[in-house]
Amino acid sequence: MWNVERGLNIDLIRAALTNPTQFNDLTSHDVPVENAAHHAAAESQLKKLQDIDLLILNEADLGMKRTNYDDVTADLASALHMNYAYGVEFIEVDPIFDLNSEEIHLPDSQQDQRLQTDLHVDAQKYHGLHGTAILSRYPLHNVRIFRLPVCYDWYATEFAAISSLEQGRRWSAKKLFKERIERELRHGGRMALIADISVPESPTGQATIVAAHLENKCTPACRKQQMTALLDQLKTIQNPVILAGDFNTTGSDNTPTSIRNEIMKRITDYQFWIKQTISWFNPLGFAKLALYPLHYFHAYNDPTAYHLPIVWDNRERPLFNYLENFRFDDGRTFDFRGRKRITDPPRARTLADSDARQWKGFVPTYSFARDYGGVVGRFKLDWIVVKPFTTNPRQSNQPLKFAPTYPTTMQELNSAPADRISDHPPITVDLPLTELPQRLRATSRQ
């Protein structure tokens, strides 16, 4: 699965998925010659991407100016020769950045002219859609959308914040630009896209794919409510189930970001405006100025770890407890075995066979960085969880057919370009359609 950050780098994404030669041509000048290990890992990951049969996308645009009005999902599905389904999560309706029903002006006439050009939206091309997709080499059946419980009202809450900003004080144009760039005015909410695929090797002849995107602007407790509602919807399914997506497991009520990232997702020519607006946000000129207090950013690599208030506060743990203890009506469970023998490099512990681990915690799938202080926090936000034919989430000696094996978090591939492909790397897992040798079933740890 891959959170593609709206498809801002669609050419690189497409090349990574379909054309290694083109990808290397696009990125070769960005890779330091001395970093041979990084390059070798990226090459291995690039090769692995060429063999995918199923792809889940989060944050895929359709008809947005920031992504040249492309249909990101259709573009990638065509390049991959895959079937696809797309579910709309949000309709973007910001009056300045999306609809052009309001204006913002800068005192410098040349900057203002360029800003108006960059903000202008072609109404004939604009659809304003943002969502989640499933792409598959297998035919898709019974496609449906399940709307998750609302944990954050994006339109009402953001509109109220904008109103208080603009009505409560007198703002300079630069200050107003900064405050508005941090807001996302849109209709809609988090959802899961669900589809069945035809798989002859499955006893039911099918597998069920669930592409989910949980809320970032809420507490971990509300994310657990969203997961609980989703699993209740899936409870009667007798097929193998692949549940994947951005669960936004930050441990807090928001995802860390930067002014740079916010400008990237709002204005097409973001590189120019990042350079121009550095001094507007910080007198020292840091392009990646944090929008959150410094104490918020800490290494948060294992949301499955034990929760010990004060000593080790892990408010995401209840969500994973619920996933582990969940039973489908057919008695099956999600696979939490974490078997060392089917991971590369060998790692054992919770979910190690479906989500790549490192020496401590999981390999992060989202990193927040500042130019003046390096990486501030690393987070494991994106997940793949699989229901194979297990009746106990931890017991080792159970079938490996349809069970997750050899997970990869493709950090090296994602960082091959100097400015990375997406703010999330792709993550993959192998699912064997036939039973694996008995010797691979052993060895699991909590």
Question: Where are each of the predicted segments found?
Answer:
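N-terminal, active-site-proximal structural segment of metallo-dependent hydrolase catalytic domains
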Residues: 1-132, 148, 158, 162-183, ...
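Active-site flanking residues adjacent to catalytic metal/cofactor-binding acidic residues
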Residues: 2, 58, 212, 244-247
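Active-site environment of divalent metal-dependent phosphoester hydrolases
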Residues: 7-8, 62-65, 92-95, 153, ...
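Charged helix-capping and loop-helix junction motifs
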Residues: 69-72, 224-230
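Conserved hydrophobic/aromatic beta-strand scaffold that supports enzyme active sites
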Residues: 132-134, 192-196, 211, 382-384, ...
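Metal-dependent phosphoester-hydrolase catalytic domains
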Residues: 140-145, 220-221, 228, 234-242, ...
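Metal-dependent phosphoester/phosphodiester hydrolase catalytic core
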Residues: 143-190, 195-228, 253, 445
